[in-house]
C-alpha cells in the first residue's frame, strides 16, 4: 500500500540513491535534502511502498510571494505507469494550495516528454523556454521548459464562500483597450439572464453611453455612474458606491476644457440615476460590504488600479463574482493577456484579499468606485 508522509532523516539514504539513479549528472545532494526536512519554507514528502521509498517531491516557498516552486518530483522506474506520478503531483499541488500559493511552477528538460505530458495533463502551461538551464548531462537536455499552474479554483457551493451560486458567471474578453467596463457589465447581464445577441456591438454601444469622453491618452474609459445608467436601462437593479462626490478621472487630464467636459458628462449620468431612484452611496465600500452584496445574490463591477498586477498605473474595470476567507474572485476582461494565458484563466481569477485592498481604487486620491448589480425584485 502506498503512503505519502513527510520526509525524515531515516529516508535520506533511499532518497539520495533514487535521486542519483534518476539524475546521475545533476543530483540533489544529501545535505540539501536534509535542509529541506528542516526548512519551514519547504514541503518534502516521500511515497512509501510499505516502508520502502519509491518516490518523493520537494516544493519550495518564498516568503511574501504567492509563487511555489516544485523543485523535485521523482518516482522509481518500476512504479511508473501506475498513476503514482499523478498522485505525487496532486499531493504537491494540495500542499501548495494549503499555503495559499497562487501558482505552482516547475522546470522540465525539453527532452523529458513523459514528465511534460504529466504536467500538461494536470493543467500546467508552458510559460518560458530557458536555454542551457540544466548543467551538461548524458541523461537529459540542458534546455528547460518552465511550466506553471494556477492553483486556487473557485468551486460553487464552497462552505466559506459567498457569490454566484446558481452557475458560474460567464467569461468575456473586451475587444478594445477602452471597453473593460462594458465587457464586465455584459458578463453580469448574461449571468442575470439578459444576454445580448451581438455582444461585440453591444460592448461598443455601452461604451458610447458610459464613456467619460477623455482620459490621459486615447479614448476615455467608463465611469461608474455611466455604467450604472447603462445597467439600469438594460433591466438590472443597480446601486453605486463611491468614496467621493468628485468626478472621477479628472486628475488624469490637464486641460481645463477637458475637465469641464468630463464633469458635465458625469453629472448628467448622476442626474439620470437620481431621477430614476438609483441609490448612490458615498462611502468607504470595502471587502465586508462587497461580501454582503455577493451574499445577497449581487455581482460587483469594481474599479481597480492595474499597478499591483503589471506595474502600470491604469484604471481597469473587473467583475467580482465571489469571495471567501482568502480571495476575491474576479472575471478580468483584459484582452492584453500573456502568450500562455487563455480567457478561462481570467475567469474566477483569485486575488488575495490583501492585494485586492491595495488595488481597489485609482489615482493619487485613491478614488473608489463600485457598481452593484442584480436582478430586479
Label every model-predicted segment.
Residues 75, 81-94, 113-121:
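Conserved acetyl-CoA-binding loop-helix of GNAT-fold acetyltransferases
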Residues 150-258, 267, 283-284:
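Active-site-adjacent structural segments surrounding the nucleophilic cysteine of cysteine proteases
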Residues 96-108:
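Conserved GNAT acetyl-CoA-binding A-motif
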Residues 1-10, 145, 152-157:
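Conserved N-terminal entry element of GNAT/NAT acetyltransferase domains
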Residues 6-78, 89-91, 95, 99, ...:
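Acetyl-CoA-dependent GNAT
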Residues 107-108, 120, 125-146:
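Conserved catalytic-core motifs of GNAT/GCN5-like acyltransferases
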Residues 250, 255-332:
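Active-site-adjacent substructure of cysteine-protease-like catalytic cores
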Residues 115, 161, 295, 299, ...:
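Noncatalytic regulatory segments and standalone regulatory/sensor domains
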Amino acid at each position: 500500500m502506498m503512503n505519502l508522509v513527510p520526509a525524515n532523516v531515516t529516508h535520506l539514504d533511499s532518497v539520495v540513491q533514487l535521486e542519483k539513479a534518476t539524475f546521475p549528472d545533476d543530483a540533489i545532494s544529501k545535505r540539501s535534502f536534509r535542509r529541506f526536512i528542516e526548512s519551514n519554507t519547504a514541503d518534502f514528502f516521500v511515497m512509501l511502498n510499505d516502508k520502502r521509498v519509491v518516490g518523493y517531491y520537494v516544493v519550495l516557498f518564498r516568503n511574501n510571494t504567492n509563487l511555489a516552486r516544485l523543485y523535485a518530483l521523482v518516482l522509481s522506474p518500476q512504479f511508473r505507469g501506475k498513476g503514482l506520478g499523478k498522485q505525487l503531483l496532486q499531493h504537491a499541488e494540495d500542499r501548495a494550495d494549503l499555503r495559499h500559493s497562487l501558482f505552482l511552477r516547475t522546470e522540465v528538460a525539453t527532452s523529458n516528454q513523459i514528465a511534460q505530458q504529466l504536467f500538461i495533463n494536470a493543467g500546467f502551461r508552458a510559460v518560458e523556454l530557458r536555454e542551457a538551464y540544466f548543467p551538461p548531462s548524458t541523461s537529459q537536455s540542458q534546455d528547460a521548459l518552465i511550466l506553471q499552474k494556477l492553483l486556487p479554483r473557485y468551486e460553487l457551493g464552497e462552505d466559506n464562500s459567498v457569490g454566484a451560486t446558481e452557475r458560474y458567471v460567464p467569461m468575456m474578453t473586451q475587444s478594445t483597450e477602452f471597453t473593460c467596463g462594458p465587457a464586465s457589465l455584459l458578463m453580469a447581464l448574461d449571468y442575470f439572464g439578459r444576454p445580448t445577441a451581438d455582444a461585440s456591438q453591444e460592448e461598443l454601444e455601452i461604451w458610447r453611453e458610459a464613456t467619460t469622453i477623455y482620459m490621459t491618452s486615447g479614448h476615455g474609459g467608463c465611469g461608474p455612474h455611466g455604467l450604472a445608467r447603462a445597467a439600469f436601462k438594460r433591466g438590472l437593479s443597480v446601486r453605486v458606491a463611491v468614496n467621493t462626490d468628485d468626478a472621477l478621472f479628472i486628475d488624469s487630464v490637464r486641460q481645463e476644457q477637458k475637465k469641464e467636459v468630463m464633469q458635465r458628462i458625469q453629472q448628467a449620468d448622476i442626474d439620470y440615476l437620481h431621477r430614476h431612484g438609483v441609490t448612490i452611496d458615498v462611502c468607504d465600500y470595502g471587502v465586508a460590504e462587497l461580501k454582503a452584496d455577493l451574499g445577497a445574490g449581487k455581482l460587483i463591477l469594481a474599479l481597480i488600479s492595474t499597478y499591483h498586477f503589471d506595474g502600470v498605473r491604469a484604471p481597469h474595470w473587473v467583475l467580482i463574482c465571489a469571495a471567501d476567507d482568502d480571495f476575491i474572485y474576479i472575471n478580468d476582461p483584459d484582452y492584453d493577456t500573456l502568450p500562455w494565458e487563455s480567457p478561462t484563466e481570467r475567469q474566477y481569477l483569485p486575488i488575495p484579499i490583501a492585494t485586492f485592498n491595495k488595488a481597489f481604487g485609482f489615482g493619487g486620491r485613491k478614488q473608489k468606485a463600485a457598481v452593484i448589480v442584480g436582478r430586479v425584485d
